[in-house]
Amino acid sequence: MTKRGKKPDWRTEGVRIVKASDVDFNTPQTCGMTRAAAINLAKAGAQKLWAGTVSVQPDAKTGAHQHGHLESIIYVVKGRARMRWGERLEYVAEADPGDFIFVPPWVPHQEINARTDEPLECVLVRSDQEPVVVNLDIEPVERPEQVWIDPNHPQG
């Protein structure tokens, strides 16, 4: 039974599959990356989550940005993600395929494709439906401080 007291029609209210060819590129963008929505209210009926893909071309980087009150999880599928964050993007760490990245609310950050020979491909999950993307004008530090994402993965 649902909250409304009637039995759900699992055929129409159950599992949803969004094909890769059906993702929506009409999302707020940041220079240097391509975002596409896969799971949201419009595509799948999701009420509390947003999920999609992010792509950064070889040897490219995004502009600095943050996502307001939203938490973000990034899963690296292909390539090497170099993340910079902080008031002046003064911290840096890298993630490889299979690694997860957590970006807390309000954190200024930048995604960089650390590879010159292949695109960086990631899956992105956010804690809400709101398309919050605040692009920032930040003067980055010259040499960011390196920080480990996971002590099992050496920096490269």
Predicted regions and their residues:
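A short, N-terminal "cap"/entry segment at the start of jelly-roll beta-barrel domains
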Residues: 1-48, 63, 133-156
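Conserved short histidine dyad/triad with adjacent acidic residue
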Residues: 35, 52-68, 105
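Short strand-connecting beta-turns/loops that link adjacent beta-strands
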Residues: 43-44, 69, 88, 116-117
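Short, charged/polar surface micro-motifs in flexible loops or helix N-caps
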Residues: 43-47, 57-61, 78-82, 131
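Short glycine/proline-enriched turns and hinge-like loops at secondary-structure junctions
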Residues: 47-49, 67, 95, 114-116
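A short hydrophobic beta-strand segment most commonly corresponding to one strand
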Residues: 53-54, 73, 102, 117-134
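Conserved metal-binding segment of the jelly-roll/cupin
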Residues: 57-59, 85, 95-115, 125-127
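A short beta-strand-loop-beta hairpin characteristic of the jelly-roll/cupin
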Residues: 61, 70-97
